[in-house]
A protein has these predicted regions:
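Formylglycine-dependent sulfatase
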Residues: 1-245
Length: 245
């Protein structure tokens, strides 16, 4: 749809302008025109960088791409503690409460919208686009989530990757003959690193793992809310894995 690369890397040449033509019918718009309530929550990386200011144009913002409701951030990433949030087209300040985290906030917003929609228009189906900022950088997660993985990666990445592929083979996640890809030359052998590097890199791995588990937890809250409103058996989940884990 005229976007040959991510929006920030568009060139202006045909097929790579970073601008979805208005002649293209977005999925959400097709569903909305056929009676769906539509909401987008979290990350929206579908708008060219020069169209993301409060001055617009807003043609490629979620609410002009078929979504009745949008709560989230525009672009590839945001601070999870102090995010740059938009409610539809309006810049809003994150709630001022202790322990605030955007993934929790966007999940609360998604659940609230879904329950309100079902309360007001129970006869209408809904389509929700739920895209967390995780686990894209910045890797911001409450300490208690990261601390759950204390010591899990102390053996270092050379050993951990071997243990991981062995576990995946035994669980049937990958074929038994699957071999590890060669390690990139730029990644040093774990045993050649200093003690400070060991501490830094193991903590980074703990934070990443905690960030991922926290995200799983929030997705679980959303799924539980769908079950609470009695729509689990009539809901289709489409999971799309991104490029950041």
């Amino acid at each position: 749809a005229n976007t040959g690369s991510i929006m920030e890397s568009s060139t202006g040449f045909p097929g790579n302008t970073g601008q979805v033509p208005n002649s293209v019918a977005p999925l959400a718009e097709m569903l909305r025109l056929n009676g769906y309530c539509t909401g987008a929550f979290g990350k929206w990386h579908e708008t060219a960088a020069w169209e993301t200011s409060v001055s617009g144009p807003f043609d490629r913002w979620p609410t002009r791409q078929g979504f009745d409701k949008f709560y989230g951030f525009i672009g590839g990433e945001t601070d999870q503690w102090v995010p740059l949030i938009y409610d539809n087209l309006t810049r809003v300040t994150p709630p001022e409460k202790e322990g605030y985290h955007f993934t929790v906030d966007m999940t609360d917003q998604a659940i609230g919208w879904m329950k309100a929609q079902q309360s007001m228009t129970p006869d209408k189906p809904f389509f929700m686009y739920y895209a967390t900022g995780a686990v894209h950088a910045p890797h911001h997660v409450p300490r208690e989530w990261a601390d759950k993985y204390k010591g899990k990666f102390d053996a270092g990445w050379d050993k951990v990757r071997e243990e991981t592929i062995a576990r995946q083979r035994s669980m049937g996640v990958v074929p038994t003959e699957t071999a590890l890809a060669p390690k990139p030359e730029d990644i040093k052998d774990w045993d050649s690193l200093s003690g400070d590097e060991h501490r830094l890199f193991t903590r980074q791995a703990e934070v990443f793992a905690g960030f991922l588990e926290q995200t799983d937890h929030e997705v679980g809250r959303l799924v539980a809310a769908i079950e609470d409103i009695g729509e689990m058996d009539d809901t289709l989940f489409i999971y799309i894995a991104g490029d950041n884990g």
